[in-house]
Amino acid sequence: MRLKRAGVPAEHRAARTKPEIALAEIDRVIASGVRFGCVLADSGYGSSGPFRQALSERGLLWAVGLSQRQNVYPADIALIFPIAKTGKPRKYHIPDQSPVSAEALLAEGKWQRVSWRRGTKGRLTCLFTARRVRVADGHKHRMLNNRMQCMPGDEVWLVGERRSTGEQKYYVSNLPADATIKTLAATIKARWVCEQAHQQLKEELGLDHFEGRSWTGLHRHALMTMIAYAFLQSRRLKAAGRKKKNRRTATTTKHAGHQASDPRPLRTTSTPTMSSL
């Protein structure tokens, strides 16, 4: 009754999980012709095996957060057919190794400092390690010790990030097996832009300030904040473009003045690209 009073359409009244809502939105934007390179999400979505599998079934690349407690198998895991000592012969294969948590598997990994882009205060760097694994997100099967255990899924990248604060984050991605650690890090950290946008929508433009009780009112409020954000973003990009143009003009003028007074060639230097949301 409350949903009806709020004007919620009948097709949106059924309860849905966050991954289900996300998949519906992904299908919607794909159908509208939007192109994107990779689906990024935090562990609230990434820890869902059905969500990751649904992305793969759609032929999408993804890099998502993962709980440190998620069980994984090494990529070289083999499925064996155990011989039952008593009783009926076993019908299904089982892994020849037990799964371990993502945290435990990467604990002894080779961590290396990776720089993925330039920020306002210099290069952004962090410690990363990566290993090919198979996440324990397949169907559940009863093992020899009578314990239920998830079977290994598809082979993917398991990535660990160790921040300067000591905090560690874990991610999983279906990027190609020949992807470099820098590519993995840059792809994972690209989600920072989305997080910044969401934070600014809430803190600067009041996305979370709506106090109404109607479906239409909520959507109008969200639409207006997004229009305002799009306008501000266009102004930022124009300002960034002008600054880059001014730097190029100043560099060209400096080169011309140098060459007029000194016949020796001036060594050119690359101008870093300004990052913007």
Model region roles, listed by residue range:
Residues 39-45, 62, 171, 192-201, ...:
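Short, conserved catalytic/metal-binding motifs centered on acidic residues
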Residues 177, 190, 194, 199, ...:
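Short, well-ordered loop/turn and helix-capping segments at boundaries between secondary-structure elements
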Residues 1-68:
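Polybasic low-complexity intrinsically disordered regions
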Residues 232-267:
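Conserved nucleotidyltransferase catalytic core and NTase-mimicking acidic/glycine-rich helix/loop elements
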Residues 1-15, 65-68, 72-193, 267, ...:
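An anionic, glycine-rich sequence signature occurring as long contiguous blocks
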Residues 222-235, 274:
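Short, hydrophobic/amphipathic alpha-helical patches that form generic packing surfaces
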Residues 50, 96, 173, 180-188, ...:
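Short, solvent-exposed helix-loop connector elements
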